[in-house]
Amino acid sequence: MASGQGPGPPKVGCDESPSPSEQQVAQDTEEVFRSYVFYLHQQEQETQGAAAPANPEMDNLPLEPNSILGQVGRQLALIGDDINRRYDTEFQNLLEQLQPTAGNAYELFTKIASSLFKSGISWGRVVALLGFGYRLALYVYQRGLTGFLGQVTCFLADIILHHYIARWIAQRGGWVAALNFRRDPILTVMVIFGVVLLGQFVVHRFFRS
């Protein structure tokens, strides 16, 4: 499958409903994200030790590790691990500027997704979106709000469905297509590009407009 950036969101009528394959991708997103969160958090604990942020909700997620979707989440976590550590400061600074709460998190998440995918969709940007969802859930939990991870999971599935990302993934065979990728230089560059775009778009949209 091609890993490059795809075309931007197509223009469709307001009454067009997602196809069954798109709805399936959105449904599968929840399991993929839970697996991604669990393994990424596990990796951070292994590499950072006591310095890693604690989150029992992430440690006790219900998983099906041998399922295809569970493997997809783990694969994306492995790909995104180095990038998340490299750009941890940028994520934290972004969240400090946005100050997300339970009341505004969905709106912020939606605007970030709109900015990130404005000029097209790629696996790099999808991984960047998952990474931001992970950081968002961790940030809010550290500020005393428990149970928010489940909301972020639902937010992400909804955004994937209604921003044409589900269509893009479905056209490539579903989430299973992500298993074709490994931690190689080309994909790493794509993920870095996605993270950089995320920061640039959000800062421009919220603080310079």
Swiss-Prot record:
Which superkingdom heads the taxonomic lineage of this protein's source?
Eukaryota
Its placement in the membrane is given as: Single-pass membrane protein
Q: Where is this region: Disordered?
A: 1-28
* N-acetylalanine carried by residues: 2
Q: State the Gene Ontology BP annotations.
A: animal organ regeneration; apoptotic process involved in blood vessel morphogenesis; B cell apoptotic process; B cell homeostasis; B cell negative selection; blood vessel remodeling; calcium ion transport into cytosol; cellular response to mechanical stimulus
Enumerate the InterPro entries for this protein. Answer: Bcl-2-like_sf, Bcl-2_BH1-3, Bcl-2_fam, Bcl2-like, Bcl2_BH1_motif_CS, Bcl2_BH2_motif_CS, Bcl2_BH3_motif_CS
The cellular location(s) given in this protein's UniProt record come to: Mitochondrion outer membrane
Residue ranges spanning the membrane: these are 186-203
Q: Where is this motif: BH1?
A: 115-134
Which Pfam families does this chain map to?
Bcl-2 (PF00452)
Kindly indicate whether the keyword Transmembrane belongs to this entry: yes
List positions binding Zn(2+).
158, 162
Presence of keyword Plastid: no
Signal peptide range in chain numbering? none
* Gene3D superfamilies in the record: Blc2-like (1.10.437.10)
Which positions does the motif BH3 occupy? 72-86
Q: Which ranges belong to the motif BH2?
A: 167-182
Which GO molecular function terms does the record list? BH domain binding; heat shock protein binding; identical protein binding; metal ion binding; porin activity; protein heterodimerization activity; protein homodimerization activity; protein-containing complex binding
Q: What does this protein do?
A: In the presence of an appropriate stimulus, accelerates programmed cell death by binding to, and antagonizing the anti-apoptotic action of BCL2.
Family designation: Belongs to the Bcl-2 family.
Assembly with partners or alone: Homodimer. Formation of the homodimer is zinc-dependent. Forms heterodimers with BCL2 and BCL2L1 isoform Bcl-X(L). Forms heterooligomers with BAX. Interacts with BCL2A1. Interacts withRTL10/BOP. Interacts with VDAC1. Interacts with GIMAP3/IAN4 and GIMAP5/IAN5. (Microbial infection) Interacts with gamma-herpesvirus 68 protein vBCL2.
Q: Print the domain comment field.
A: Intact BH3 motif is required by BIK, BID, BAK, BAD and BAX for their pro-apoptotic activity and for their interaction with anti-apoptotic members of the Bcl-2 family.
Name of this chain's protein: Bcl-2 homologous antagonist/killer
